[in-house]
Amino acid sequence: MIRQRGRVTAALFSAVALVAVSAPVAAAGGTGGARHGEHGGGASSVREWLDLLVEEDGVPGALAHQGRRSVTAGTAEPGSGRPMVGAEGRFRMGSNTKAFTAVAVMRLVADGRLRVDDRAGRYVPQLADSPITLRQLLKQRSGLPDYAGLVDWEKPLSDEGYLGLVLREDPLFEPGAEWGYSNTNYLVLGMVIARASGTDYRTYIERTVLEPLGLEDTYWPGPGELTLRGPHARNYGIHPLHPEQGRTDVTDLPAYEFFGASGGLVTTPGDLNAFWDGLFGGALLPRWAVRQMTHDTTDVGGRDVYPRGSRYGYGVASIPLTCGGRYWGHGGDLPGVSVGGGRATDGRGTVTVYTTTVAAQGARLAHLQGAVDAALCGRR
């Protein structure tokens, strides 16, 4: 359901042969996405990459936003004549939400209310007998299966209910032994935040992340809220409730009920860029906490959809740039949307690229990654 540059949850996208992911990551393993320097397609500028997504890959609409500049391609709604929305358009950020959740956890660590090596069972009774630590949850090393592949989309459950489904399954591996992307890790971290802070994780993230950065266009959908607020493009993909319909309009989705701390936030390109700038610019956490998020990492290059040289930390991933250096972000995919981008480490800026249908594998993924790379390498 959500994943870093690509993990689309198996349940969500089985109809289109996407293996569990969320994303940035998603729920299952993969063969890896476009490699460093191998985005393909022959494009060079951001606009050329977006045009490839629309003209060759069949993506209805695509946008790249960097600084005060937006580049768009395609339409906001096929058949309507509406141009693709610009920087004001809202979209579901998918697994980029994991970075917000990780920041909230590290805020509690900085305040002395959590330690990364605490056992999750100290805060989540269902895991009382498990050795899984918060560090392992943050780094996707817990071995917990992905709840996204187990849900009944006609019967939403509480977070405890989803975790209960997971605990009936065999673990993917012993905690800490391997790396395996799973939305369940951040489902559990949302529960930890609630217990440690004494308030719902949505409220805590609003108070400690959204409000300090002034992210007024970023929000958690409420219970039963299916439509996006404000201006937005329509989204197209396989609807989890009606996979037999094939590709259809999936703009309206039950985000509150299913995506939560793993992928439930709605945002705009400007707000998401402001988040990355705020996080890596020191506006949200002490410097040591950001350093821990980005230095306690696992090599995930060539796994899932990560290019060679990528590393996964605490809800953030670093991806190499063809012009040298790297950028930190996360990425995310849901039915009808893929999001890439982040902040370069050497002052080259911050960018968000998103499409109005899933671009989590093959040429689409390569072209989306190419647009991010072109923007951060100055090839506009």
Please name every model-derived segment.
Residues 2-6, 27-71, 247-380:
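Catalytic loop of the DD-peptidase/beta-lactamase superfamily, centered on the K-T-G motif
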Residues 5, 9-14:
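Sec-dependent signal peptide hydrophobic core
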Residues 20-25, 108:
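Hydrophobic membrane-targeting alpha-helices
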Residues 49-53, 65, 93-113, 119, ...:
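Primarily hydrophobic membrane-targeting regions of prokaryotic envelope proteins
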Residues 63-65, 92, 136-138, 180, ...:
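Structural recognition of the beta-strand scaffold that forms the well-ordered cores
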Residues 77, 131-327:
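Short, surface-exposed loop or secondary-structure junction motifs
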